[in-house]
Amino acid sequence: MAAGVDCGDGVGARQHVFLVSEYLKDASKKMKNGLMFVKLVNPCSGEGAIYLFNMCLQQLFEVKVFKEKHHSWFINQSVQSGGLLHFATPVDPLFLLLHYLIKADKEGKFQPLDQVVVDNVFPNCILLLKLPGLEKLLHHVTEEKGNPEIDNKKYYKYSKEKTLKWLEKKVNQTVAALKTNNVNVSSRVQSTAFFSGDQASTDKEEDYIRYAHGLISDYIPKELSDDLSKYLKLPEPSASLPNPPSKKIKLSDEPVEAKEDYTKFNTKDLKTEKKNSKMTAAQKALAKVDKSGMKSIDTFFGVKNKKKIGKV
């Protein structure tokens, strides 16, 4: 699916290529604003990020971008530079609501949700309140109060204890999905955490939990991620048990140290080796030939000839 966006530069609409499910394409046909791109807060960084709302089914999707250098798209009769591939994946809106609940918790009181989810920078956050089943979702991360005799409003307050239990379930669900899809995570955990080879092989279940924790941490604040790590009783990565130097993975920008002496393949060393090697019978016969009057092949590639070549 290619979507046109006017960049306002007079060049025309810039097109973006999206990989979406068929039912999302149908939503754009049923309603004029069936699919809506909005800028909302990233619950991990607090910065802005692009999300996709399915207004027909009231669903929220995060927009991811896959990019490589020197790629372009051929769209109908045009060429779109950049070669970016956008794809939309469902995201639990509770992750975004957590950002506002944690922020409102500093006031230390119960509040109605429409007073909690308020953002002058990202005003479209009110769309989160229109998502179905919101009250059931909030039950996982908040304490609730309400008096039906006075009004039908409910008041919410962030609960860290409930949130950690909910996040633990998310981690367990992620672990199950990783195993079902036969995703090998031990090498990834080992390379990022500097675990020894023996430790990574014996703690396979822990590797899955640690990797799942890392995935979930992309949707929650850093402080909450640290609390979740403690709640899951994940040990701190051990830097005191490195692998042998020949197997150690370097995570710096510096090149990995060579395991062999590659200098033996240098041109200078090869010439020296040729001089020291014994001459064959043919080479000895060639050495006895009278070379007077002959020009060395190097003369054809001397300084003068190089200048001529440079002028061409």
From Swiss-Prot:
Non catalytic subunit of RNase H2, an endonuclease that specifically degrades the RNA of RNA:DNA hybrids. Participates in DNA replication, possibly by mediating the removal of lagging-strand Okazaki fragment RNA primers during DNA replication. Mediates the excision of single ribonucleotides from DNA:RNA duplexes. It is linked to Aicardi-Goutieres syndrome 2: A form of Aicardi-Goutieres syndrome, a genetically heterogeneous disease characterized by cerebral atrophy, leukoencephalopathy, intracranial calcifications, chronic cerebrospinal fluid (CSF) lymphocytosis, increased CSF alpha-interferon, and negative serologic investigations for common prenatal infection. Clinical features as thrombocytopenia, hepatosplenomegaly and elevated hepatic transaminases along with intermittent fever may erroneously suggest an infective process. This is Ribonuclease H2 subunit B. Keywords: Acetylation, Aicardi-Goutieres syndrome, Disease variant, Nucleus, Phosphoprotein. The RNase H2 complex is a heterotrimer composed of the catalytic subunit RNASEH2A and the non-catalytic subunits RNASEH2B and RNASEH2C. Residues 236-256 are annotated as: Disordered. It is found in: Nucleus. The modification N6-acetyllysine is found at K295. GO terms for biological process: fibroblast proliferation; gene expression; in utero embryonic development; mismatch repair; negative regulation of gene expression; positive regulation of fibroblast proliferation; regulation of DNA damage checkpoint; regulation of G2/M transition of mitotic cell cycle. The keyword Cell inner membrane does not apply. The keyword Protein transport does not apply. GO terms for cellular component: nucleoplasm; ribonuclease H2 complex. The modification Phosphoserine is found at S296. Widely expressed. Belongs to the RNase H2 subunit B family. The modification N-acetylalanine is found at A2. Pfam families: RNase_H2-Ydr279 (PF09468), Ydr279_N (PF17745). Its main location: nucleus. It comes from Homo sapiens (Human). InterPro entries: RNase_H2_suB (IPR040456), RNase_H2_suB_wHTH (IPR019024), Rnh202_N (IPR041195).
